[in-house]
């Protein structure tokens, strides 16, 4: 018997309704879901992508983001920590904002460092944000675009500024050196195998942070922080046509990368036998077990297809039903686990996993994990019931209807992340109406208990 995933790949047909998804139209699982026309999506000649969206919810305000499709895994073994170090240097001088003039100017218009001006570096994605920007003068918009322009490829990266920041990041490393950080680093080899994901702790080591040559940081920046790996996302109370014109003008002088280095596709190797790791830490307050069932992720180019969305919906339904069971069991007297949860997690761009998280009552972790895993095995053998499916389906539909009815109340940040997920992962960027139509038909018309149980 073919699995549901195999059936999706071979092509199951769905009846989808709505503008662009009509009742007379049957879409194959390989069909692309319609994109929200209220988002202006474009690409500049230098390869930079952009997403612009008007949102009147926050009157007179806008969020400005630059997103990089790179992160710590682009570091070589001798560069561990450079991506995060660059995050700090974004605020330490650029072509048009020397020294700390950027922060001082932003504060002069009412923005706060750490709240409205911030950044985050991940394993495979990095972003820098300017949020709740007051659009009270046209010159403010021009300056925001100029900041994004400089972040794209015009950091000063002066030796004295780099040396000054070394101690700041070393102190951050010391502050983060808690039980969660240490346990996570030790567990990485078991989860990610012998890959870069297992050998990057985001911050680096104190020795490296204090001694690396500043030119190494400049070379890393020039190699990876380039327009073909970047996207600008701007959402707020502005005219999209005017913003697009300004964006194109400001970013026009950013050159196309010459001889760009290709991003390595990193795949997590399969293991012939189960990998088991026992990790202890004197500051760990709870006794936990995490169990991963890895699988290849849907390729990025297929993520905006009907089939990927349908598969994700079935996984969402199955994990929700499983978690209802766990919740009921945890309330029973004598249950060895305080909590248990099953969730789908994207480990990397190429690898997803079903993760079972178990927190024991006291230190009885073996009994707690055995109990939770036993329930998971029971579902694998005997499946869920129609009553369980109906309960979860009703809850998801209720939430979907509420999201559709309140779509006009979404803040800029929520709309920004829809664009970011489309850029980085190719997650469907659907309108609320299309999303609600798809949700209803997948749950109410197409999905069956047999399909979920065979997943």
Q: What positions do the PLM features span?
A:
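Bacterial N-terminal signal peptides
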Residues: 7-19
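Mature N-terminal segment immediately following signal peptide/propeptide cleavage
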Residues: 28-66
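Active-site-adjacent, His/Asp/Glu-enriched structural segments that form or flank metal-binding
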Residues: 59-60, 68-182, 196, 201, ...
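Scaffold signal of the M16-like zinc-metallopeptidase fold and its non-catalytic homologs
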Residues: 92-94, 119-124, 144-147, 151, ...
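Acidic/histidine-enriched alpha-helical segments
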Residues: 99, 103-107, 156-174, 239, ...
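Structured mid-domain segments that build the active-site/substrate or prosthetic-cofactor binding neighborhood
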Residues: 295-300, 304, 308-386
